[in-house]
């Protein structure tokens, strides 16, 4: 399952901004970077008229698994999990979240990875 279009984080400027300005939250198998998108420099002529929301992206490198089938399965699993967890949330500001899986994450089961993801989202204050 793919993240809904309004929840996708895209564009290299967004990722650069998250890496420079975002807060990091660590677990044994992933890193969550979160930032308030309202702090981003405004692009001239482009004003966001949409309601505040949560946009996210997931990065799974070749170091996690050499097999693209496994990486895509993980990506789909996380997209489905995040779309269920974050779709009905209401927030007062726009939040950007970026999850990077560590190479050691394949030692854990899928359910353990999703639990760690939930813990990081709670730790970051995105979910309760």
From Swiss-Prot:
Keywords: Endonuclease, Hydrolase, Nuclease, RNA-binding, tRNA processing. It catalyses: Endonucleolytic cleavage of RNA, removing 5'-extranucleotides from tRNA precursor. PANTHER family: RIBONUCLEASE P PROTEIN COMPONENT. Consists of a catalytic RNA component (M1 or rnpB) and a protein subunit. Its EC number is 3.1.26.5. GO terms for cellular component: ribonuclease P complex. One of its GO terms (molecular function) is ribonuclease P activity. This is Ribonuclease P protein component. RNaseP catalyzes the removal of the 5'-leader sequence from pre-tRNA to produce the mature 5'-terminus. It can also cleave other RNA substrates such as 4.5S RNA. The protein component plays an auxiliary but essential role in vivo by binding to the 5'-leader sequence and broadening the substrate specificity of the ribozyme. One of its GO terms (biological process) is tRNA 5'-leader removal. It holds the Pfam family Ribonuclease_P. The gene is rnpA. Belongs to the RnpA family.
């Amino acid at each position: 399952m793919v993240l809904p279009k309004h929840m996708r984080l895209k564009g290299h400027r967004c990722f650069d901004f998250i890496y420079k300005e975002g807060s990091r939250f660590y677990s044994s198998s992933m890193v969550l970077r979160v930032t308030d998108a309202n702090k981003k420099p405004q692009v001239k002529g482009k004003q966001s008229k949409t309601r505040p929301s949560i946009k996210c992206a997931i990065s799974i490198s070749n170091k996690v698994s050499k097999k693209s089938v496994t990486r895509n399965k993980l990506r789909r699993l996380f997209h489905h999990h995040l779309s269920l967890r974050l779709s009905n949330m209401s927030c007062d500001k726009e939040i950007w979240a970026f999850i990077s899986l560590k190479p050691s994450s394949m030692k854990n089961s899928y359910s353990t990875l999703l639990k760690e993801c939930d813990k990081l989202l709670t730790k970051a204050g995105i979910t309760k």
